[in-house]
């Protein structure tokens, strides 16, 4: 019994040392802090009103508490211009009968950011995310739900990448 409790104490101390050393070196889980300092106070987002990506980006920018989302481009310090947004589904592999076994889902968007004078703050940038999805024709409805979930996950990843890029941009001087 004594050896068992001693083992447990040694493991607990080792875990504590590992945790404190990773925290001490500045390591943080992605998104654990979530606070970004934006180089502007207001931004206009050039997304269609029905864009789910635009809605999620607005929600995340408002959550920072530092940025006002302008209704008109003329009222904003920065203008986010959506150049393109596409979703694609391609066959990745086939089984021995020639039926689809796997799909490759791709979510690509390109954008630029300009200041109020039209000066480019972020050059045209393209972000492309990919996910593999196994397919089983006996579970079509479940796979449709999985596909929608994967696209939502990629959309959330895109929003986080956009926010990090906005936070890292340098204002025009």
Language-model segments: what does each one mean?
Residues 81-126, 130-145:
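Surface-exposed short loop/turn segments
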Residues 2-4, 8-11, 21-66, 171-173:
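A structural "domain/chain start" motif
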Residues 61, 65, 113, 117, ...:
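Sec/Tat-exported extracytoplasmic proteins
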Residues 66-77:
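Short acidic low-complexity segments
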Residues 47-55, 100, 104, 144-157:
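Soluble non-cytosolic domains of exported or imported proteins
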Residues 141-173:
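C-terminal/domain-edge helix-coil "capping" segments
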Residues 12-16:
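Alpha-helical transmembrane segments
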Residues 34-36, 71-72, 119, 125:
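Short secondary-structure boundary/capping segments
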């Amino acid at each position: 019994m004594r050896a068992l409790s001693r083992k447990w104490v040694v493991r607990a101390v080792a875990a504590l040392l590992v945790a404190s050393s990773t925290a001490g070196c500045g390591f943080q889980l992605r998104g654990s802090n979530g606070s970004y300092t934006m180089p502007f106070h207001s931004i206009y987002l050039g997304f269609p009103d029905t864009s789910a990506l635009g809605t999620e980006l607005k929600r995340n920018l408002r959550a920072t508490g530092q940025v006002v989302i302008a209704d008109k481009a003329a009222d904003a310090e920065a203008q986010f211009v959506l150049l393109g947004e596409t979703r694609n589904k391609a066959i990745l592999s086939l089984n021995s009968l020639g039926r689809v076994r796997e799909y490759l889902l791709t979510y690509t968007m390109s954008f630029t950011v300009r200041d109020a004078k039209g000066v480019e703050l972020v050059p045209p940038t393209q972000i492309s995310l990919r996910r593999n999805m196994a397919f089983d024709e006996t579970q079509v409805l479940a796979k449709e739900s999985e596909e929608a979930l994967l696209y939502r996950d990629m959309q959330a990843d895109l929003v986080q990448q956009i926010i990090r890029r906005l936070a890292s941009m340098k204002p025009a001087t």
